[in-house]
């Protein structure tokens, strides 16, 4: 079987890891292996391809099982382990590899993210520690269109997180890279663009100012700060050119292309080590190694064959790389450029220098911009209208000037003359100053798009193929039909009688969206934390991705886990009204007796009492929403005292189809009397898996279930959406119904709360 065919089998074999709901067990894998071995004995390329694909599927699934093994066997108790740090902020966040557990070596080492202080020695990469750890499986919030942190953690081979109970340094020496980085950081203290230079040279992006990150995102140049194929291939090219130049002063028998090629690969590996050996850098090195091997084979390979072999080798070496978004961005970027230059090449010999170079750069950037639209929209929910102009400026400056200057300065920093190093750093700093001066002159070009644009984003691919085949001449009806299908989401409208309530997965907090006819209301805005809030990170992207216009906010009470995202949301939709029991300026009242209508839905406030301005859980704004057939009771954080007072005054109005479980399922709420009076069919609870109060309480869960409620909670189900219509209501949970994936499961013990 030819190598590209084998690579194609590997790619096909690993793709099921993207959508398998559960991983096949040992008996299924044994059966697949036996079938593959039986097929190998038969003749024919197709049969051999099926057999190899089956064997590689088994390999991929076994790799996934191995990645999940620590979540089943290393959690649930305090463990003592030896950990080698690979990354640290020097304070309370550390990433590393567990190499020994209770005296036994772990192979392969288990990646872990740790929280806590390491004393008395200052933490740095490369240190060897003996730690007492409280380990737990990775668990992430899951919202439609949001960042998938569980998938990301598994792609990075870090299935565990934990707290440091105790630690002692077995070897406090920092790694050679960490010592070099410290020396380099001290050397660059006087340069204004030192953070960007460290990012480009060493892959250190933690110190980048937020303003620079936002600017690069808005101009579509963030990819330049990632140590990816572009930087590592550039480092390899510099080594190759350097060695090629040296060869010209050597005897003729020493001149050849093989030695520079191998030296370039060695230089790429060395640079990847210098940048921390992150997974994208390792994948790039493997791809370069495959390219070198194909070149050394003496055969002719097409661009598509090289692409297949590189991607196939990466996925065989690391099957979980199939979960990595950065891998698919890189793979599709290369595939898109191959497609672009083959299907829409520039006419040869039409322009002279310098116009030939300028037009070639524009042609290249146009291909990247247009053909990556589907992935960019799917991953980032928007496009940069200024990315073309920004990259035409940034790519030459960074790749041809800044990065070579930085790499040369890093080499000179080891032993070269100080004056030469200073001149190199100064030149790189001035190049970056020119770059960001130009980027700041561009208008804010970031355009947020919603899910309706996903299908139409593949139009550039279809237009190139249609232009090449002249389809618009031969099959105009087919072209119009395809265009109609791509634009169909823009004309599709939900049923007029349908409305939805979505409980977003915001961790230990509450944020619910009521939507109808393309409009939305919020009940609470989730928690906030020192670096951000749920409004900025979850609610605003979710509303925009679903093409919803926010018209109002109901705020249950003043606690930060319920109002944390309020300021961010109001900044995005300043015209939205706010209703709360707090009596704050510009807030409409939310007290018992208040009634209003919105989009044909009836809203009735049941608590707190009129005129009350007290604060706290027991003064949460309780609202009942109904459409005349079905209803939902939103309770905030009320506890038993408020429940009993509300029932004694307003018990006739509490009956509802569904209830938002009060106070995240705390044992101080959801009294038996309230559960009985509401008499609902389902209960929805919002909490985080690892909250300090172990909510929802096991007793509360059982209380609802014994009364016939169906129980739904964001730790288990992720985002929960209730669809109301004339036919009744349905609940769709993201983790186990809409996107049931093996990497979305609840890893570890069956329950951690209660």
Give the ranges of each region predicted by the language model.
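Membrane-interface helix/helix-cap signal primarily in integral membrane proteins
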Residues: 54-223, 533, 537-541, 545-549, ...
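Membrane-interface helix caps and helix-loop-helix hairpins in membrane proteins
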Residues: 20-22, 272-281, 296-300, 317-327, ...
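Aromatic-rich juxtamembrane segments at the membrane interface
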Residues: 155-285, 292-293, 422, 568, ...
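Transmembrane helix-bundle segments that form internal channels/tunnels in multi-pass membrane proteins
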Residues: 1-74, 78-82, 243-255, 259, ...
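Metallo-beta-lactamase
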Residues: 550-561, 659-663
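Active-site HxH/HxHxD metal-binding segment of metal-dependent hydrolases
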Residues: 554, 558-593
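Core dinuclear metal-dependent hydrolase active-site scaffold
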Residues: 315-316, 320-322, 440-548, 552, ...
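Cap/insert and terminal regions of metallo-dependent hydrolase folds
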Residues: 643-718
């Amino acid at each position: 079987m030819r190598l590209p065919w084998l690579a194609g089998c590997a790619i096909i074999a690993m793709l099921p890891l993207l959508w398998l709901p559960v991983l096949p067990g040992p008996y299924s894998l044994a059966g697949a292996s036996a079938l593959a071995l039986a097929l190998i004995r038969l003749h024919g390329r197709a049969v051999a391809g099926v057999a190899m694909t089956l064997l590689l599927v088994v390999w991929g699934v076994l790799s996934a099982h191995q990645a999940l093994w620590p979540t089943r066997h290393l959690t649930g108790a305090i463990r003592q382990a030896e950990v080698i740090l690979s990354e640290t902020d020097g304070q309370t966040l550390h990433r590393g590899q567990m190499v020994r557990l209770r005296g036994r070596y772990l192979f392969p080492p288990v990646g872990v993210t740790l929280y806590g202080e390491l004393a008395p020695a200052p933490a740095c990469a490369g240190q060897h520690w003996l730690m007492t750890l409280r380990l737990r499986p990775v668990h992430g919030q899951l919202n439609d269109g949001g960042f998938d942190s569980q998938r990301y953690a598994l792609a990075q081979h870090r299935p565990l997180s934990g707290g440091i109970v105790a630690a002692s340094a077995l070897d406090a020496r920092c790694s050679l890279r960490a010592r070099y980085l410290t020396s380099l950081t001290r050397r660059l203290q006087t340069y204004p663009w030192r953070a960007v230079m460290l990012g480009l040279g060493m892959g250190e992006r933690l110190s980048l100012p937020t303003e620079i990150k936002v600017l690069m995102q808005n101009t579509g140049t963030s990819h330049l700060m990632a140590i990816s194929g572009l930087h590592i291939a550039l480092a390899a090219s510099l080594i190759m050119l350097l060695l090629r130049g040296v060869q010209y002063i050597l005897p003729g028998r020493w001149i050849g292309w093989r030695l520079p090629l191998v030296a370039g690969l060695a230089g790429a590996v060395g640079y990847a080590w210098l940048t921390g050996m992150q997974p994208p850098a390792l994948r790039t090195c493997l791809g370069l190694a495959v390219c070198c091997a194909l070149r050394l084979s003496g055969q002719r390979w097409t661009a598509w064959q090289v692409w297949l072999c590189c991607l196939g080798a990466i996925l065989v070496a690391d099957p979980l790389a199939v979960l990595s978004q950065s891998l698919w961005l890189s793979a599709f970027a290369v595939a898109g450029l191959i497609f672009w230059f083959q299907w829409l090449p520039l006419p040869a010999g039409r322009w002279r220098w310098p116009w030939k170079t300028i037009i070639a750069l524009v042609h290249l950037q146009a291909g990247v911009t247009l053909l990556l639209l589907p992935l960019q929209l799917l991953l980032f929910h928007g496009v940069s209208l200024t990315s073309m102009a920004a990259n035409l400026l940034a790519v030459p400056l960074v790749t041809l000037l800044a990065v070579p200057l930085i790499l040369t300065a890093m080499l000179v920093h080891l032993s070269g003359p100080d004056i030469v190093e200073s001149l190199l750093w100064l030149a790189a700093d001035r190049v970056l100053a020119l770059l960001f001066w130009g980027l700041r002159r561009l208008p804010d070009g970031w355009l947020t798009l919603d899910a309706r644009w996903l299908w139409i984003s593949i139009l550039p691919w279809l237009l190139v193929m249609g232009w090449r085949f002249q389809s618009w001449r031969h099959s105009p009806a087919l072209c119009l039909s395809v265009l109609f299908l791509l634009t169909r989401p823009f004309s599709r409208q939900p049923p007029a009688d349908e409305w939805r309530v979505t409980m977003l997965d915001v961790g230990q907090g509450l944020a619910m969206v009521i939507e109808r006819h393309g409009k939305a209301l919020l009940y609470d805005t989730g928690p906030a934390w020192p670096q951000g809030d749920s409004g900025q990170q979850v609610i605003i992207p979710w509303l925009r991705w679903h093409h919803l216009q926010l018209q109002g906010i109901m705020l249950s009470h003043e606690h930060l886990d319920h109002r944390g995202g309020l300021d961010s949301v109001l900044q995005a939709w300043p015209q939205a009204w706010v209703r709360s029991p707090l009596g704050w300026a510009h807030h409409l009242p939310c007290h018992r007796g208040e009634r209003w209508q919105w989009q044909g839905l009836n809203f009735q406030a049941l608590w707190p009492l009129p005129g009350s301005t007290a604060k706290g859980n027991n003064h949460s704004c309780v609202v009942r929403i109904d459409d005349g057939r079905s209803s939902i009771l939103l309770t905030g954080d009320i506890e038993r005292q408020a429940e009993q007072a509300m029932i004694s005054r307003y018990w006739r109005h509490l009956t509802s189809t569904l209830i938002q479980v009060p106070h995240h399922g705390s044992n101080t709420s959801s009294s038996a009397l309230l559960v009985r009076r509401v008499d609902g069919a389902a209960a929805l609870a919002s909490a985080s898996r690892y909250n300090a109060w172990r909510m929802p309480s096991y007793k509360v869960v059982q209380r609802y279930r014994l009364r016939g409620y169906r129980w739904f909670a964001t730790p288990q189900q992720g985002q929960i959406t209730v669809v109301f219509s004339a036919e009744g209501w349905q609940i769709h949970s993201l983790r186990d119904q809409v996107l049931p994936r093996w990497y979305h499961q609840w890893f570890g013990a069956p329950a951690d709360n209660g």
